[in-house]
């Protein structure tokens, strides 16, 4: 039985009779091929990437596993349509917090139509795409105090400036109520989610190492998904704790082009900028912890 993804935070959402992705109960994600060339283009990318022996094994884990295409009943009731069949990257989580971040200082690319170029450049300038090299596209957080999800409003997210993006990244790893805009995010989960040898930062740095040399593809208008489960941190790895914790995935490949032997500076530059934001948050948390420790020691 196919259903609308519960944890999708950006992109085309299959609701109110609209065409969008679906998921099943077996951990598969069905993404409809868009009617123009973009859907076919994305399928060809997955086929190329999956079989490309030049892509290191450790890099493949940052991409959804591709299972080909399949005709399934479309979410808009238009009948059977071809869909990409991918691993549902959040299927292993009970209550995942998810953030979608579009990487790159531009989302358009050479030889696009004038209409598409104008659409992209307008949105790129209105968001932090041009100024920061990335933009937060959407996110949701599991509020363990309320045992429910809080989702950032799309209009608010698209209006973020640099401070707004920084605040969102801090809120994403905080334990205090995400719904209360008057609260300063406490970044209670930052060290466990962003930090550590297997945390978000370590994964982003591994991707960065590859992007500094790879010339196979140019990842235009692609996103990074960050996923984690705060309950597993709160339960401190007990027997009943959900797993895994933090994960990075790259998604949305309808606009990927051949690299033709040239480094993808657009994606790499945006990735480096995003990494700096994550590093800054971790450093501020470490500094705060050191201050608290010093105050405790002096108060003995």
From Swiss-Prot:
Induction: Induced by auxin, but not by salt, abscisic acid, mannitol, water or drought. Phosphorylated by KIN10. InterPro entries: IPK (IPR005522), IPK_sf (IPR038286). Keywords: ATP-binding, Kinase, Nucleotide-binding, Nucleus, Phosphoprotein, Transferase. Pfam families: IPK (PF03770). Expressed in leaves, stems, roots, siliques and flowers. Detected in vascular strands, stigma cells, the abscission zones of fully elongated siliques, the root central cylinder and the root tip. The modification Phosphoserine is found at residue 78. GO terms for biological process: embryo development ending in seed dormancy; myo-inositol hexakisphosphate biosynthetic process; pollen development; pollen tube guidance; regulation of DNA-templated transcription; response to glucose. Down-regulated by KIN10 through its protein phosphorylation. It is found in: Nucleus. Disruption phenotype: Loss-of-function mutant atIpk2beta-1 (T-DNA insertion) is fully complemented by AtIPK2alpha in tissue but not in seeds, leading to the generation of phytate-free seeds. Increased sensitivity to 6% glucose during seedling development and decreased germination in response to the gibberellin biosynthesis inhibitor paclobutrazol (PAC). GO terms for molecular function: ATP binding; inositol tetrakisphosphate kinase activity; inositol trisphosphate kinase activity; inositol-1,2,3,4,6-pentakisphosphate 5-kinase activity; inositol-1,3,4,6-tetrakisphosphate 5-kinase activity; inositol-1,3,4-trisphosphate 6-kinase activity; inositol-1,4,5,6-tetrakisphosphate 3-kinase activity; inositol-1,4,5-trisphosphate 6-kinase activity. It catalyses: 1D-myo-inositol 1,4,5-trisphosphate + 2 ATP = 1D-myo-inositol 1,3,4,5,6-pentakisphosphate + 2 ADP + 2 H(+); 1D-myo-inositol 1,3,4,6-tetrakisphosphate + ATP = 1D-myo-inositol 1,3,4,5,6-pentakisphosphate + ADP + H(+). Its EC number is 2.7.1.140, 2.7.1.151. It comes from the Eukaryota. It is an enzyme of class 2 (transferase). Interacts with KIN10 and KIN11. Belongs to the inositol phosphokinase (IPK) family. Does not bind calmodulin. Inositol phosphate kinase with a broad substrate specificity. This is Inositol polyphosphate multikinase beta. The lineage of its organism: Eukaryota, Viridiplantae, Streptophyta, Embryophyta, Tracheophyta.
């Amino acid at each position: 039985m196919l259903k609308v993804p519960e944890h999708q935070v950006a992109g085309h959402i299959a609701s109110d009779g609209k065409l969008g992705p679906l998921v099943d109960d077996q951990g598969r994600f069905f993404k409809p091929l868009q009617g123009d060339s973009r859907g076919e283009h994305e399928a060809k990318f997955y086929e190329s990437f999956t079989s490309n022996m030049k892509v290191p094994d450790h890099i493949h884990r940052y991409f959804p596993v591709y299972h080909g295409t399949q005709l399934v009943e479309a979410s808009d009731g238009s009948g059977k349509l071809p869909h990409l069949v991918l691993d549902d990257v959040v299927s292993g989580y009970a209550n995942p917090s998810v953030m979608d971040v579009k990487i790159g200082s531009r989302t358009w690319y050479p030889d696009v139509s004038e209409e598409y170029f104008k659409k992209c450049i307008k949105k790129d300038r209105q968001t932090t795409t041009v100024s920061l090299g990335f933009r937060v596209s959407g996110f949701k957080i599991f509020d363990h105090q309320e045992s429910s999800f809080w989702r950032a409003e799309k209009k608010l997210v698209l209006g973020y400036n640099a401070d707004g993006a920084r605040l969102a990244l801090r809120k994403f790893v905080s334990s205090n109520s995400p719904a209360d805009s008057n609260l300063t995010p406490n970044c209670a989960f930052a060290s466990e989610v962003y930090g550590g040898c297997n945390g978000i930062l370590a994964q982003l740095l591994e991707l960065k190492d590859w992007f500094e040399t790879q010339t196979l593809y140019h990842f235009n208008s692609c996103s990074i998904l960050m996923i984690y489960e705060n309950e597993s941190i709160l339960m401190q790895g007990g027997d009943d704790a959900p797993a895994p914790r933090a994960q990075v995935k790259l998604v949305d490949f309808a606009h990927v082009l051949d690299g033709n032997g040239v480094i993808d500076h657009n994606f790499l530059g945006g990735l480096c900028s995003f990494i700096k934001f994550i590093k800054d948050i971790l450093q501020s948390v470490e500094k705060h912890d050191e201050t608290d420790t010093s105050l405790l020691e002096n108060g003995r």
